[in-house]
């Protein structure tokens, strides 16, 4: 027999509502059921107007990040059996609400765009391969898994009061390309994150590290950016391979 759990879901439509509310739904939950499957049940059987994002259902696309029982998580990976009998779901913070659990992620992606999230390889000989050794690639293994879900951005306290702060995802992505042996734009990249809304705005609270579903550890990436900047100030001839 399926266990019934109570879901308290944030609801708000800025076009019609003056303030938000929480709607309560009773959902029969079977073993192995995820929060995303519960939301699907609500939408298909109880309230078809409920709005939320989802796509892959396998923790790959990052679409279904939301605030579940006090923590930012991927709904498709969160097992209901690991949660309490009453489950509260809210949208991600620091972004405008489009409707219910759907937020406008434009600021998140604009900040990502600002740090030039692509290789800038310099000018190799025409037709030459940009060779990367296994060790050089292995260094990036823990960084490249970011799925741009926005959980780190929503959990970041600095993003809550500084709208211009680049945020953990953009800064971690900066480190990903800075430490790529094929990239030749070190000074350009560091200059992009070295202003008052950049890397030194981070207070090292580890919120982003705690919520990252892919263990990218934005905090460690940001710390490396700080080291890289300071090392260059102390030693203009410094090479990033030194750290």
Task: Specify the residue positions occupied by each region the protein language model found.
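Ferredoxin-type iron-sulfur electron-transfer modules in oxidoreductases and energy-metabolism complexes
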Residues: 33-48, 87-243
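DNA-contacting interfaces and partner/effector-binding or oligomerization modules
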Residues: 53-54, 63-67
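Eukaryote-biased recognition of intrinsically disordered, low-complexity regulatory segments
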Residues: 3-24
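Beta-rich nucleic-acid/ligand-interaction surfaces
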Residues: 57-59
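Short, contiguous acidic and Ser/Thr-rich linear segments
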Residues: 22-34
